[in-house]
Amino acid sequence: MADPAECNIKVMCRFRPLNESEVNRGDKYVAKFQGEDTVMIASKPYAFDRVFQSSTSQEQVYNDCAKKIVKDVLEGYNGTIFAYGQTSSGKTHTMEGKLHDPEGMGIIPRIVQDIFNYIYSMDENLEFHIKVSYFEIYLDKIRDLLDVSKTNLSVHEDKNRVPYVKGCTERFVCSPDEVMDTIDEGKSNRHVAVTNMNEHSSRSHSIFLINVKQENTQTEQKLSGKLYLVDLAGSEKVSKTGAEGAVLDEAKNINKSLSALGNVISALAEGSTYVPYRDSKMTRILQDSLGGNCRTTIVICCSPSSYNESETKSTLLFGQRAKTIKNTVCVNVELTAEQWKKKYEKEKEKNKTLRNTIQWLENELNRWRNGETVPIDEQFDKEKANLEAFTADKDIAITSDKPAAAVGMAGSFTDAERRKCEEELAKLYKQLDDKDEEINQQSQLVEKLKTQMLDQEELLASTRRDQDNMQAELNRLQAENDASKEEVKEVLQALEELAVNYDQKSQEVEDKTKEYELLSDELNQKSATLASIDAELQKLKEMTNHQKKRAAEMMASLLKDLAEIGIAVGNNDVKQPEGTGMIDEEFTVARLYISKMKSEVKTMVKRCKQLESTQTESNKKMEENEKELAACQLRISQHEAKIKSLTEYLQNVEQKKRQLEESVDSLGEELVQLRAQEKVHEMEKEHLNKVQTANEVKQAVEQQIQSHRETHQKQISSLRDEVEAKEKLITDLQDQNQKMVLEQERLRVEHERLKATDQEKSRKLHELTVMQDRREQARQDLKGLEETVAKELQTLHNLRKLFVQDLATRVKKSAEVDSDDTGGSAAQKQKISFLENNLEQLTKVHKQLVRDNADLRCELPKLEKRLRATAERVKALESALKEAKENASRDRKRYQQEVDRIKEAVRSKNMARRGHSAQIAKPIRPGQHPAASPTHPGTVRGGGSFVQNNQPVGLRGGGGKQS
């Protein structure tokens, strides 16, 4: 076990509300609260760790009383929570509550759930073995609630002198559901009874024990913790509870065991050397919880009623006494071989220090006995003694080394380096002393030595008597000191290894710190992502609520419209007949309405088919017109392209014509000039003898030029004629194109007009068809109504005839029998008057039916008109409803997809987060066949579990899948 530490028992006080009987009795609420830790009863304050008022919820009580103990139990400490108080003060409600109600459950079901949740969040290298027991102390006998055949179990002590119930059933569990099933099973076997103060009074003390063992698969460290959850029976006054017979015997035993508990609390509070644990089996079982190795929380439950004021004060005094008790708690650790070795070495070092202290004190004592005065600087000093012991051990270790090693050390280390190493070793020794938590023990040793110095004379006398024994003991210690020289070498080597390991561990710590920082950054990122997803989910919830509200409003409006239709059809226009014909007439009206609806549906189907055929024909006509229009547009575009090409060609021809005319003019002029020059040259060659013919040549040249001009003029006129012809052709083509455009526009207008005419005719045809169908339907409905009315009238007429015949027959028989009595008896007269009244009523009914028939015929057109309006309204509502359903379906599908996406994201995050959580391994017990292979026992991840063949199956936290 680890080093112990002291802690006080925590005491919580809870007041229940006034119950119904106390309210009816007119009791006063005597408790007054001051802050969260003090309550006033009759002007006297009582202070506790926490005081809960009557309005405190179960969850708040659990958070303040029990939530911290879960962590302590899983870290290897023992824990106890028990409720104390008088009967009907709310102890069972505090400890158990409503086991399966999330708000009303008490400490036990909440702590069970928290244990598993905490395990899932722990290191994945941990394996857990969890087993539970449930028993009660009834009539001072221990009775197993999970096996009712075990009715008188005994209390024993283990090797550590810790009490336990021998033979009690222990069940291995691996999920909260299994624990709750065990609690339900045990609770069904517990003793309860009805008293004047409580309808479900516990007649026994119940103890639910959770034993948790954990093992680190890497370091092989094993921890164990026990959690006692105790529901005590309440103290009783027979005058108030009205106990009799067996209930009275139970009350005696309950009060006796609670009195023993009070004696134990008083003895512990007063610091008595004797504590009467064995006076009761309950105090024997709770011995470790009261003053032992356990973190204990007591919940004292009180009644605020003035009727129970004395019992409340007694309970508060009990809590105040219990609050002063101190427990010494330590971690329950099973040490490994390596840990035992380290502990052994540690104890050897302590033993060596104590021996040096004894030797120092003996030397000082001998000097005092010899009459010497020991100076203050030579008297015993703990720090000086430790330093000299360390130096002596070092000298012994150095002198005991081999010569070769000494030579090597002398050769390799100088005095300065040796001193430095010695200082370093001294620092390491000091650190080891600090880490081994020897401060407390050294202080205890100092206190003991001070006490010894105060009683020095008595100590001197005792040492004189035991001098011989001490001399022998000194000889033995000297021999042990010689033997421990070798151990000093081992210690030095261990220190060197420890220094190396320390460096390695420091490096590992740095690496782990960096890894932790990276994981922290990643966790912050994941948290931010989760926050954004939560915000998005909130938006989706708001959108969903808006859509739901909108759908609800639409449905409300639809229901309102349908209600108006029902009122218009069923209540106002149809008159309720009188007398016995009401049911028949309602049946007739309903049948008529159903037949109308059937015929209306048939008419609608026919009309839809006709509209479909008409629409098909219109579509065909529209397609033909569109094709014709497309052909016209194609021809127009072709003509436009042709006109454009001809215009371009005409422009090119005109340009070429101008160029040719210019070139011809220039060439003609050049030719004339050349010919004139040639003739002039020829004439010059003939010299002067031909001067007289110059005029003739000149005339000839002028004539030739004139002929060329005429030829050019003719060519120009012919080209101009050709240009005029081309322009005329262009004008004709433009006129033709304009006509085609106008024709196209006319065709388009004609097409639109035909289309509109077709639509108008279709609409009129539809209206005429609807009118014809409605008239036909009204005719058929009227015919059916007339037939129905005729049948009803015929039936009434036949009944009237039969009734008249029967009446005549009876009157005739009565006249024959009573022919002598002309006046007749009073009974016969009454009978005749009754029949006459019936006949008169039938006649009135017949007339009323005739009038109703006439009214119905008059109201038939109105009803048909209203029915048509109703049908149109129903169609509009159906279309709106269909559209709303489609929109709602789309929104629901989109919302479902978004929810699935968010669930998948959250599930993946949970899987990633649980991937490094703790494990609850399946315990292996002798005599059982494993559920899986012998080398790999089956496990269940993520809290899932199953029980097969009554074998305990455990958990590995952080998963969700069975191996």
Swiss-Prot record:
Reported consequences of knocking out the gene: Mice are embryonic lethal. They show perinuclear clustering of mitochondria and impaired lysosomal dispersion.
Main location: cytoplasm
Region annotation Globular: where it falls in the sequence: 915-963
CDD domains: Khc_CBD_cc, KISc_KHC_KIF5
UniProt domain Kinesin motor: residue ranges: 8-325
Keywords for this protein: Acetylation, ATP-binding, Coiled coil, Cytoplasm, Cytoskeleton, Isopeptide bond, Lysosome, Membrane, Methylation, Microtubule, Motor protein, Nucleotide-binding, Phosphoprotein, Ubl conjugation
One GO MF term attached to the UniProt entry: microtubule binding
Any one GO biological process: natural killer cell mediated cytotoxicity
PTM sites of type N-acetylalanine: A2
Ranges in coiled-coil conformation: 329-914
Membrane topology label: Peripheral membrane protein
UniProt cross-references to InterPro entries, sorted A to Z: Kinesin-like_fam, Kinesin_motor_CS, Kinesin_motor_dom, Kinesin_motor_dom_sf, P-loop_NTPase
Cross-link (Glycyl lysine isopeptide (Lys-Gly) (interchain with G-Cter in SUMO2)): K213
GO cellular component, one term: endocytic vesicle
Annotated ATP binding sites: G85, Q86, T87, S88, S89, G90, K91, T92
Family per record: Belongs to the TRAFAC class myosin-kinesin ATPase superfamily. Kinesin family. Kinesin subfamily.
Record-given protein name: Kinesin-1 heavy chain
Organism for this UniProt entry: Mus musculus (Mouse)
